[in-house]
Amino acid sequence: MAVDKGFKKIPGSYKYKIASEPWEFEAIHNLNYKTFVEEIPQHKKCLDRKLIDKFHGENRYLICVHGEILLGMIALRDRRPLSLDLKIGNLEAYLPPFKSILEYRLLAIKEEYRNSSVFAGLMKMAFNTALRKGYDVAVISGTTRKARLYGHLGFKPFGPFVGGHGAIFQPMYIDITSAFEFKKNSRVLTG
């Protein structure tokens, strides 16, 4: 994998895609470790500094890369039970009626790219995927530090907080039709 020392942020050179290459999955495991072990203490440390998600085989990873450098990712999963089902139980009790549900998981962006277009590009791709595949509702466990940002995208909080030990998350949902309307009117997610 390429080393990104001295890389300049050039938005036109970002590529958004579904992860498919071995190096991309390796980079995903490394970014998961950095984000969800070192930064947000959700999992225990390990010597190989990799975190392979327990639903890895079922996840569809949407990624942003520059060459062979992973800048950010989000995982999509629709197989029940969702991780939020396991954390709070009966999701249907908290959500408006829906026919199909998608979970956005493991949103992670390299620290030096968090104030770039990477987040918006990943969310645009996630919304487009949900709309194209016919999902009614998407859910996410958003870190409480970024709950306001998710709110600006149209996500609504529901249910109790989940997590613990310095990693508190707010379950949130978005009606996919609303997300599409928001996307049409958003300067951030258009283009």
Model-derived features: where do they sit?
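Conserved acetyl-CoA-binding loop-helix of GNAT-fold acetyltransferases
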Residues: 114-128
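Short, functional N-terminal and low-complexity linear motifs
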Residues: 1, 91-96, 114-118, 137-139
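Cytosolic beta-strand hydrophobic patch enriched in CBS
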Residues: 61-65
